[in-house]
Each structure stands twice: as structure tokens, then as C-alpha cells.
């Protein structure tokens, strides 16, 4: 049953996108998919890239309570995280497991496989940039680049 509430409304029902660990592709910024550099020289920066048939674009969503999840890159086991200071542009990176709110993400379901991903520690939203190297950052939920689509690997 569709909700009559606007997606950004505080009344939006927060539904869990994944009830148990599940591997998905996360599509954002047009025909681009969430991916990450796997070397320290690039700070394990998260980016979006065109479709690749490999597990660097596969992410394990694990529910840790309510609609809060950890998001783990399948290819290397590192967890989605983000810098929380503006001098680092709130860049999204992957890091080893830290068991803190910088690695916990609230999934706000809009239905039809579309949702927003909000970092629990600071309330900023995962955002796919469409310029430069297609870097992923966190920011306010004020544009379409914070809408993601979940798909099967």
C-alpha cells in the first residue's frame, strides 16, 4: 500500500530495506553504481562507476536494529564510512569494522527499490556527485543525488 506522505516528511514510515544480511548493488547518479578504490593511496574513497560485472560493486546490507544497517563491500570486507569534517569534504570511504555510528546507516525506503541512505552519526545523506571523479560524499537531503536504487547483484 502506497503512503500518502511526502518522502522527506518526518511522518515517513521508516521501513527496513533488508531484514537480514543481503548482497545488493546500489545505483545512484544515473547509470552508475556504488564502488570504492581498494588502495590506501586513494584513501579507499567511495565512487560511482559504470556497471562492472565484479564484486567491487556488491554490498552486504546487515540490519543492526530497526532500519539501521552496516554496508560492507563484498570484495574486501571493508565497511562504508565517511569523514565527518568539511576540510575532507565529507568524503565517503571504506574502513575496517569499527562498531560505531560512523559505520551505521539508516535506510529510508521510498518504495519501488528507491531509498535514501543516512549516516547515523551525523544525519548526513549518501550523495553521488556527478562531476570530477564521481566521488561519493555525505550531504543534506536537498537533491536527487541522495536517492539510491537497490538491485540484485
Summary of predicted features, one role per range:
Residues 2-153:
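Lectin-like carbohydrate-binding module/patch detector with strong preference for beta-trefoil
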